[in-house]
């Protein structure tokens, strides 16, 4: 009987691994989404996903890395990482001028950034679990964060809050935890890798396949 039970567990684990989890990384601009995506991808595959930049909306299309096998606390999970364009309530092309981008290219970037936000919102229908990344040095109670979490809750999509940039002296990750106490919470530095193992624990514990 024990042998049979062991076989059943093996079969369950086998098919669980065959069902990849689509893990969407969402948040405002410049909260470290791409840095976090690169950290996860490099830790488990040795390869990064995209280019991180201090310029807002550097990621303007969904960037993907598929079939990443992560392991934590004796659990295995195969994920497809989806690094989403940064969300914003308003995009002003003049914001890009401060980074030495000429007016023509700034307007193009603003248009692409707007399209990227629309694409990211559409992808909410295709992700299984979301890492909602927030900058631990800033006020978490923004319209973007509140709207994002409200949409995820309405769609029944599991969420893990990630307070990023805890390596900064001004970081106050507890502000995020206290603002949204109903969600699983991890504080990390995607740049240095601090507490990243705690994030992998949370992903293997809370991520699930839609349906």
Task: Show the residue positions of the predicted features.
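Canonical P-loop GTPase G-domain recognition
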Residues: 22, 165-211
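Conserved G1/Walker A P-loop phosphate-binding module
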Residues: 1-99
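Conserved P-loop NTPase architecture
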Residues: 1-26, 138-142, 146, 156-158, ...
């Amino acid at each position: 009987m024990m042998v049979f039970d062991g076989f059943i567990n093996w079969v369950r684990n086998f098919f669980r691994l065959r069902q990849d989890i689509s893990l969407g990384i969402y948040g405002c601009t410049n909260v470290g989404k791409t840095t976090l995506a690169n950290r996860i991808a490099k830790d488990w595959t040795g390869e990064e996903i995209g280019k991180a930049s201090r310029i807002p909306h550097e990621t303007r299309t969904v960037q993907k890395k598929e079939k990443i096998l992560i392991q934590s606390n004796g659990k295995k999970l195969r994920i497809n990482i989806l690094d989403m364009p940064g969300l914003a309530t308003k995009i002003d092309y003049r914001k890009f001028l401060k980074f030495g981008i000429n007016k023509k290219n700034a307007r193009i970037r603003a248009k692409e950034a707007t399209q990227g936000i629309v694409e990211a919102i559409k992808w909410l229908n295709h992700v299984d679990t979301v890492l909602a990344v927030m900058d631990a040095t800033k006020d978490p109670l923004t319209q973007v964060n509140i709207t994002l979490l409200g949409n995820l809750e309405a769609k029944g999509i599991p969420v893990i809050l990630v307070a990023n940039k805890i390596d900064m002296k001004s970081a106050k990750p507890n502000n995020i935890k206290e603002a949204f106490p109903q969600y699983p919470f991890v504080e990390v530095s995607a740049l240095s890798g601090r507490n990243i193992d705690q994030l992998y624990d949370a992903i293997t514990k809370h991520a699930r396949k839609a349906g």
